[in-house]
């Protein structure tokens, strides 16, 4: 076998990449598929003394049992003989328990259905040569009785084929042909051996891609036996470790990204070493680690398989299992670990952490629940769905909700970011109140007092006049955020307020919104996604902040507006209403929870905005109250204090409500 050279760093990355992707291979065979990788990981785990890899190999083997079918060819390369040979090998090496006559009975019967006399391909990988080798291995397998796995008629037909066929063109099979008759007559036994396998069948091409053509290369790696070249652990910091696990998504540019920043602030000067792990990252296809300002950042790549090609529940189950294997090189089982899961789809990750890190604590934050987004938080609709579980129109909502419940029950603590979220966790998900901690979001106070001259300068910078009255909204442009309602309400306001301008900040598709303001396009600015500095500048020159969401768990944008002293108008039925305390610190629009009521909702929004624009004293009063509310409830110091007390146990306070 040709020697292939690779540096250590590349080797680690190849193995990590393999862990993430092997479960999604459609080939379950020996040379390029799952069976070959089962053998690799079984040996690898034993060599580097990491049980996670041996368990991983066993779970891959279970997948082979699930996916094997009668439509597979019977050859050695990617068919039944190769899979059967692999199982004989695993039992022989002590990686797998059981009687191979029982395990392989169905495979042996399928192989006997094919008449060997009709084979024209005599090669080892795809033809008769491989079948002969498999039969030799099976006949040599230890057994307590004289009962053979193949009947006498089939064995006689193989004897005739070996004596009659011309194998001279297959030079690598010469010793196999000689030995076959001896094994058939009970005069010799042979054991499955990988090195012999590759002597018989030279690889068609040399590859260092363990995923596609890596069985030969993987075996060469293992034969070296040099653990330092094969395995790397990533030890870290203190005895107490806090792992915040997130998934890459567009929301990282918005709320989730802000949450990570507030977590970094909250963990400063704590006894825990903070690691932020981003899953399904586009930055790598394996695992990448870097450190910044005493925080370790780990990116774990996605898979070659796209989630839409298989059931999403199965996809996450397999992906998160792979993540658990990679985490074994990062998090020690005997350390004081807290795993904080930042996504409601992480049920299988939580399950794996429970099983493999029994001394650790698992926490999750409920940023949102899918059913609330789809139903706009309407409990009446949810009650209908729960009472009609077989209604096909809502089947997906029922399935996701049940998965969410299973996930939450696996967690030791569940963080609710709003009171209505707390209530939902108790009433809908059935969680005991003692398991839930209520910690509102908080952000760092970056408010800057500005003179009228400074504000005028910023207005000119963005193309506004000094006497313009600016309404501003920020968030992704989609129906849920109510931007179309704002555009329609604005179209009704412009005739009454000649200096009124509308600024919409955020990504998404503005087409629907633009159509509603086509006659006033010169007075509407779509600025797209902007950085925080520019966003806060825009807030500083605006007169009213408008967040007309039909549903929102607890919006960071509202906190940023209040921090900057903006009077805000928000939708009801969500955490936004809680932020303004039901109308004490901002105006609440009584929307109907129905996309079909857009005209009615736009009219209600128009009425509220018209009232606020006409009443200067109300705006000035809400400016002061908005800022006061932020300082007393949503400054980062509030979040940090309650997080340390209620989540990581500093001061041992265990209250579940905030004042």
Describe each region flagged by the PLM:
Residues 567-570, 580:
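Short hydrophobic beta-strand element within catalytic cores of glycosyltransferases
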Residues 370, 386-414:
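Membrane-proximal helix-turn-helix segments that form the acceptor-binding/catalytic region
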Residues 513-533:
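Nucleotide-activated donor-binding/catalytic signature segment of Leloir-type glycosyltransferases, i.e.
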Residues 529-530, 537-542:
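Short alpha-helical donor nucleotide-sugar binding micro-motif in glycosyltransferases
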Residues 234-285, 334:
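N-terminal subdomain of nucleotide-sugar transferases
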């Amino acid at each position: 076998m040709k020697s292939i050279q690779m540096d250590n760093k590349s080797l680690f990355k190849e193995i990590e990449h393999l862990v993430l992707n092997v479960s999604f291979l459609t080939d379950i065979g020996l040379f390029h598929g799952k069976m070959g990788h089962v053998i690799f990981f079984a040996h690898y785990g034993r060599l580097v003394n990491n049980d996670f890899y041996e368990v991983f190999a066993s779970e891959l083997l279970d997948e082979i049992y699930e996916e094997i079918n009668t439509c597979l060819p019977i050859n050695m390369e990617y068919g039944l003989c190769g899979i059967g040979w692999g199982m004989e090998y695993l039992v022989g090496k002590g990686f797998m328990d059981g009687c191979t006559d029982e395990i392989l009975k169905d495979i042996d019967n399928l192989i006997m259905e094919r008449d060997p006399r009709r084979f024209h391909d005599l090669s080892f990988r795809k033809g008769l040569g491989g079948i002969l080798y498999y039969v030799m291995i099976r006949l040599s397998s230890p057994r307590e009785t004289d009962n053979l796995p193949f009947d006498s008629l089939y064995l006689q037909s193989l004897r005739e084929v070996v004596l009659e066929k011309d194998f001279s063109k297959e030079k690598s099979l010469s010793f196999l042909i000689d030995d076959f008759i001896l094994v058939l007559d009970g005069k010799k036994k042979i054991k499955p051996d990988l090195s012999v396998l590759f002597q018989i069948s030279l690889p068609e091409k040399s590859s260092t891609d363990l995923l596609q053509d890596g069985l030969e290369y993987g075996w060469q790696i293992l034969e070296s036996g040099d653990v330092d070249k094969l395995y790397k652990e990533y030890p870290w910091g203190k005895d107490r470790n806090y792992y915040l696990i997130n998934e890459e998504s567009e929301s990282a540019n918005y709320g989730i990204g802000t949450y990570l920043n507030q977590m970094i602030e909250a963990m400063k000067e704590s006894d825990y070493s903070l690691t932020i792990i981003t899953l399904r990252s586009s930055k790598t296809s394996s695992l990448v680690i870097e450190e910044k300002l005493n925080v370790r950042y780990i990116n774990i790549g996605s898979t070659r398989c796209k989630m839409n090609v298989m059931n999403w529940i199965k996809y996450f189950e397999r992906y998160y299992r792979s993540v658990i294997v990679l985490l074994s090189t990062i998090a020690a089982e005997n350390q004081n670990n807290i795993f904080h899961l930042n996504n409601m789809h992480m049920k299988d990750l939580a399950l794996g952490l429970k099983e493999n890190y029994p001394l650790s604590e698992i926490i999750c934050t409920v940023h949102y629940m899918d059913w609330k987004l789809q139903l706009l938080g309407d409990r009446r609709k949810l009650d209908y769905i729960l009472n009609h579980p077989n209604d096909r129109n809502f089947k997906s909502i029922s399935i996701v909700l049940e998965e969410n419940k299973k996930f939450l029950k696996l967690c030791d603590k569940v963080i609710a970011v709003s009171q209505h979220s707390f209530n939902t966790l108790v009433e809908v998900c059935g969680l005991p109140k003692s398991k839930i901690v209520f910690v509102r979001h908080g952000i760092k106070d970056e408010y800057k007092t500005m003179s009228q001259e400074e504000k005028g300068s910023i207005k000119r910078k963005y193309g506004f006049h000094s006497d313009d009255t600016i309404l501003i909204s920020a968030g992704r442009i989609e129906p849920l955020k109510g931007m179309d309602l704002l555009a329609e309400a604005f179209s009704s306001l412009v005739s009454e307020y000649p200096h009124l301008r509308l600024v919409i900040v955020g990504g998404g598709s503005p087409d629907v919104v633009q159509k509603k303001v086509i006659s006033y396009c010169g007075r509407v600015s779509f600025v797209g996604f902007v950085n925080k500095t520019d966003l806060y500048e825009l807030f500083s020159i605006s007169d009213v902040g408008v967040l007309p969401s039909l549903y929102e768990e607890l919006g960071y944008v509202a906190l940023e507006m209040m921090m900057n002293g903006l009077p805000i108008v928000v939708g009801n039925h969500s955490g936004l209403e809680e932020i303004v305390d039901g109308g004490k610190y901002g105006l609440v629009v009584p929307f109907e929870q129905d996309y079909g009521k857009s005209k009615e909702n736009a009219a209600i929004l128009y009425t509220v905005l018209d009232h606020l624009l006409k009443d200067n004293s109300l705006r000035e009063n809400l400016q002061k109250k908005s800022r006061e509310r932020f300082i007393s409830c949503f400054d980062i110091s509030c979040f940090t204090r309650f997080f340390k007390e209620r989540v990581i146990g500093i001061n041992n306070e265990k209250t579940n409500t905030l004042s």
